[in-house]
Amino acid sequence: IQKGRLIGVVPKRNLPNYSEFYEARNFCPGNERPVMTCWNGEKVPMGTNLLFRCNTMPELTVAAEICEDVWVPCPPSIRHALAGATVVVNCSASDETTGKDMYRHDLICSQSARLVCGYVYANAGEGESTQDLVFGGQNIIAENGTCLVESRRFINESICADMDLERLDSERRRMSTFPDPAAAREEGGYLTVEFSFDAVSEDSARSQDTQAHGSTQPGGDVLRYVDPAPFVPRDERQRNRRCEEILSIQAMGLKKRLEHTGCHEAVIGLSGGLDSTLALLVTVRAFDSLRIPRSGIHCITMPCFGTTDRTYNNACTLAGKVGAKLREINIREAVTRHFEDIGHDMDKHDVTYENSQARERTQVLMDIANEVGGLVIGTGDMSELALGWAT
């Protein structure tokens, strides 16, 4: 229903007839391929394979399934997502039993992750409860595996949240295994109903009672919290787990490379900064897992024009603490000679000035690695790589 007008009817496809459910006694499954039915003097499409596409918001295509549909091995929402639906809505009457809410929560979130979609789950509440069944009104809005907002049960609470439809669209385009929706639409006999969607004003967004689940942020009508540090969890335990996981992944990758090449020596340019420090810790972990003596780790500190006592002392302390070999090679004279060779002004601190030092350090590391028969450990980070630049 949109603006007081019925634009499509989606029937239930899977009817439960077990435990407390006996729907198949009185009902039959709805048809998949849409047919036209008459409603209030107008022809309206009816069928499970209906898509509602917003012509004013290209990334918004809505499909629907009913209650039990999402609990079956092959839910209709799978076909809907493959046909192009970015948001799936589920009108449900799922009764309460002990522990069912947690299963229901995981089910909705996992379905949104599998389909790379938004999933809006609206469940029956107190007004639908009878002497046979109790409905808790557990409403959930999930996006690509993340629960954006969930209502508290048994208090008839409404919820709302923002979905990043452009991100969902981008994720699907990135996945080569997510098929072209046109073929799925044709195969499933899908009918697309066009509708328009007026943008919600800031005032109306703020006026909605979100019960502190999606309060608006200052300066805009965005209801969801946008984490300024998305890769760094705020919860300390989760953050520690994430850091441990990152170190383990990197160490395992380096371990495999050391095993494959038969190298028992590693060379690191240790500046005392963050990136080279983490690279050293990863290397130490990889060596320990292979039971290779840490003395096979060669830390090279190469002071030049911008080196401070603090970073130099950090490098020396780190190498000593982990039991690695430390070697100092001052590259100031070599870089100065290079500037003279190319006629570069020493007082001109431009890209050439900075990169010449980095290139000289790399040459030193490569040569030492050749001498000891080892591998140079890269100290570049993902931010550099994203910008097309590497240490």
Segment roles from a protein language model:
Residues 1-269, 285-294:
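Enzyme catalytic cores with a strong preference for nitrogen-chemistry domains
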Residues 66-70, 94-101, 232-244, 301-308, ...:
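Hydrophobic alpha-helical scaffolding
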Residues 89, 95, 116, 336-348, ...:
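Nucleotide-activated chemistry modules centered on ATP-dependent adenylation/adenylyltransferase
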Residues 89, 264-270, 274-316:
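ATP-dependent adenylation/pyrophosphate-handling site
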Residues 93-94, 124, 271, 302-305, ...:
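Short, ordered loop/turn segments at secondary-structure junctions
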Residues 111, 249, 253-261, 273, ...:
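Generic, well-ordered alpha-helical scaffold segments in large soluble proteins
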Residues 160, 208-227, 292, 296-352, ...:
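A conserved beta-strand->alpha-helix junction
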Residues 263-276, 332-335, 381-385:
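A glycine-rich phosphate-binding loop feature that marks nucleotide/adenosyl-phosphate handling sites
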